[in-house]
Amino acid sequence: MAPITTSREEFDEIPTVVGIFSAFGLVFTVSLFAWICCQRKSSKSNKTPPYKFVHVLKGVDIYPENLNSKKKFGADDKNEVKNKPAVPKNSLHLDLEKRDLNGNFPKTNLKPGSPSDLENATPKLFLEGEKESVSPESLKSSTSLTSEEKQEKLGTLFFSLEYNFERKAFVVNIKEARGLPAMDEQSMTSDPYIKMTILPEKKHKVKTRVLRKTLDPAFDETFTFYGIPYTQIQELALHFTILSFDRFSRDDIIGEVLIPLSGIELSEGKMLMNREIIKRNVRKSSGRGELLISLCYQSTTNTLTVVVLKARHLPKSDVSGLSDPYVKVNLYHAKKRISKKKTHVKKCTPNAVFNELFVFDIPCEGLEDISVEFLVLDSERGSRNEVIGQLVLGAAAEGTGGEHWKEICDYPRRQIAKWHVLCDG
């Protein structure tokens, strides 16, 4: 039989072919991975950024460089100032300070010798390096002044509005307030700060720092809201509340400013604005609303079960819209608070449904010296909450509060529910 011979060259070619295919496979895999990464990165950059809030103090620019050009320093800045057209010194502040919230210019504030200039004045839109006019209708506020509010001077609020399309950011800069009234009668000064809310949702609430002992506070604080589409800006409104901090009691409310953004064009640049501060428009209703409470006294375990069921017809706390109510429950023994509970906050509703149960241990036999206080409050993030209404149930309580208390004492172990009218807190 002839011997079988194999070619060694065939075995030598196999590793070479495998190596070539492996190299091609590796290059293809790396290229595919790089392509997928690039696609993911580009898709992320095109998505609308999630809501994000940035707060900048003391006028630090959130955009250190212009979007289209770098910032110039030194001699270049001087040349820019020289090349800018001369702007009359009073073109901004005279136009805006003399205008009321309806966009009108009262004749009583006109300077002698120049009545026509200010009567025909219009609000100004200031851009980077140029200025253009805006129709007066775009700056009108829906809040009108009464004769009493015009007589009472509460000062002027200065601020600016801007929308950055590249970053999808709405920017509000609270610059200063001038001519605030003195809320401290001893020092004849105030400790002012400002709360700002974006309406109608009321979910964006911010506030400035407190400036001590001044009637002309210069805040210069920038608040930036990311993720608000420009098409939605026209549907919003800004509500500013000017307050004076009080260390020992509730902060004093100086006044408020309401700015509807409908008709205000922010597509061309930053807009400088000011508004007269008006007295807070608290709606005086015939009542403070009603509260549905269920009580049950367990004489065997000496416990009191309190169920906060519903609230209805709660008034608006101010022009910022509906309140965010919650209920605080305080248990008193001989006029001393021994326990406290509170419900969750219900957002933007005058008719809240709570359905929350609390069990209190009674430290004595019977309910003679026991009373329960219910406080309905409007939740305000970052500040002291305002009391909408109050209710007291106990042996010494008048009206339905005393009747409800007598029923649970006469019928222990029975859950008894009643509606109660809230009174001023």
Curated annotation (Swiss-Prot):
<dbReference type="GO" id="GO:0045956">
    <property type="term" value="P:positive regulation of calcium ion-dependent exocytosis"/>
</dbReference>
<feature type="binding site">
    <location>
        <position position="252"/>
    </location>
    <ligand>
        <name>Ca(2+)</name>
    </ligand>
</feature>
<dbReference type="GO" id="GO:0045202">
    <property type="term" value="C:synapse"/>
</dbReference>
<dbReference type="GO" id="GO:0048471">
    <property type="term" value="C:perinuclear region of cytoplasm"/>
</dbReference>
<keyword id="KW-0677">Repeat</keyword>
<comment type="subunit">
    <text>Interacts with KIF1A; the interaction increases in presence of calcium and decreases when SYT4 is phosphorylated at Ser-135.</text>
</comment>
<feature type="topological domain" description="Cytoplasmic">
    <location>
        <begin position="38"/>
        <end position="425"/>
    </location>
</feature>
<feature type="domain" description="C2 1">
    <location>
        <begin position="153"/>
        <end position="274"/>
    </location>
</feature>
<feature type="topological domain" description="Vesicular">
    <location>
        <begin position="1"/>
        <end position="16"/>
    </location>
</feature>
<dbReference type="GO" id="GO:0014059">
    <property type="term" value="P:regulation of dopamine secretion"/>
</dbReference>
<protein>
    <recommendedName>
        <fullName>Synaptotagmin-4</fullName>
    </recommendedName>
</protein>
<keyword id="KW-0968">Cytoplasmic vesicle</keyword>
<feature type="domain" description="C2 2">
    <location>
        <begin position="287"/>
        <end position="420"/>
    </location>
</feature>
<feature type="transmembrane region" description="Helical">
    <location>
        <begin position="17"/>
        <end position="37"/>
    </location>
</feature>
<dbReference type="GO" id="GO:0098978">
    <property type="term" value="C:glutamatergic synapse"/>
</dbReference>
<dbReference type="InterPro" id="IPR035892">
    <property type="entry name" value="C2_domain_sf"/>
</dbReference>
<dbReference type="GO" id="GO:0005509">
    <property type="term" value="F:calcium ion binding"/>
</dbReference>
<keyword id="KW-0812">Transmembrane</keyword>
<dbReference type="GO" id="GO:0043025">
    <property type="term" value="C:neuronal cell body"/>
</dbReference>
<dbReference type="GO" id="GO:0030672">
    <property type="term" value="C:synaptic vesicle membrane"/>
</dbReference>
<dbReference type="GO" id="GO:1905415">
    <property type="term" value="P:positive regulation of dense core granule exocytosis"/>
</dbReference>
<keyword id="KW-0597">Phosphoprotein</keyword>
<feature type="region of interest" description="Disordered">
    <location>
        <begin position="73"/>
        <end position="93"/>
    </location>
</feature>
<dbReference type="GO" id="GO:0150035">
    <property type="term" value="P:regulation of trans-synaptic signaling by BDNF, modulating synaptic transmission"/>
</dbReference>
<dbReference type="GO" id="GO:0017158">
    <property type="term" value="P:regulation of calcium ion-dependent exocytosis"/>
</dbReference>
<dbReference type="InterPro" id="IPR001565">
    <property type="entry name" value="Synaptotagmin"/>
</dbReference>
<dbReference type="GO" id="GO:0099519">
    <property type="term" value="P:dense core granule cytoskeletal transport"/>
</dbReference>
<feature type="binding site">
    <location>
        <position position="249"/>
    </location>
    <ligand>
        <name>Ca(2+)</name>
    </ligand>
</feature>
<keyword id="KW-1133">Transmembrane helix</keyword>
<keyword id="KW-0472">Membrane</keyword>
<dbReference type="GO" id="GO:0150044">
    <property type="term" value="P:regulation of postsynaptic dense core vesicle exocytosis"/>
</dbReference>
<dbReference type="GO" id="GO:0030154">
    <property type="term" value="P:cell differentiation"/>
</dbReference>
<dbReference type="GO" id="GO:0070382">
    <property type="term" value="C:exocytic vesicle"/>
</dbReference>
<comment type="similarity">
    <text>Belongs to the synaptotagmin family.</text>
</comment>
<keyword id="KW-0479">Metal-binding</keyword>
<feature type="compositionally biased region" description="Low complexity">
    <location>
        <begin position="135"/>
        <end position="146"/>
    </location>
</feature>
<dbReference type="GO" id="GO:0014049">
    <property type="term" value="P:positive regulation of glutamate secretion"/>
</dbReference>
<dbReference type="Pfam" id="PF00168">
    <property type="entry name" value="C2"/>
</dbReference>
<dbReference type="GO" id="GO:1990742">
    <property type="term" value="C:microvesicle"/>
</dbReference>
<dbReference type="GO" id="GO:0098992">
    <property type="term" value="C:neuronal dense core vesicle"/>
</dbReference>
<dbReference type="GO" id="GO:0000149">
    <property type="term" value="F:SNARE binding"/>
</dbReference>
<dbReference type="GO" id="GO:0000139">
    <property type="term" value="C:Golgi membrane"/>
</dbReference>
